[in-house]
Amino acid sequence: MDQSAPVAPDITRPDAGVAIVREFVAGTAGRQRDLIDAAFGAVRVAAVPPTLLSLTWLASTDGEKVLSYAQWTAEDEALLFSRVLGTSVQQAVAARAPGITASPAVSYRRYRSAARPDAPPPGCIVIGTVEFDGPDADRQRAWIDLVLDALESEPAPDAGGGSRHFHVSTDGTRVLSYAEWIDEASHLEAVAGDGTVGDGSGVARARAFPGIVRAGVTRYRIERAIAGGGAL
């Protein structure tokens, strides 16, 4: 695999069949760096198959979490390799930053995107997650459609916002949004009411959508990226 500068992955690339996403709780900015450096080192020396297209590590701006976002051509090989590589990564992380906890990996497929090709390169990635009370692929898509309809009805997009990419988990229970922003301040300003994020009846309906049991938003910065398959 080739090391690359920490640039944003191409979320819409057509050969990305699945995204494997995992969240880690680090607790401090220093432990975030230790976790990412350890995981990055373990992956760089691994025999990674060409079906891994990209792997990106993001650190939350509050110093609490790390997110890994891996693009693969197919889910089966992704999950198989992730189990093998996961042991090496966990050992490396435990040696460098003991006590870090991780959530189970979740498989997603991109469903829809709202592109802003004129937007500048993102300095902040806002990850939103929604979990439902059971599997229902139609409900996942209906929720995303509602949100995108609400965003498209805005009179003018927020100046700091970029493209937004909505994913559905392959088990039918979750939705993940990957939103690009110029910087953290732009997103904070928008959600505080000086922009359009969170305004309007469509967004209100999305928040009150039946069956939602958990939802959250976290702001991240891209820290490390590795490209496979000749990409990134």
Each language-model region and where it sits:
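Short S/T/G/P-rich N-terminal loop/turn motif that feeds into the first structured element of a domain
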Residues: 1-232
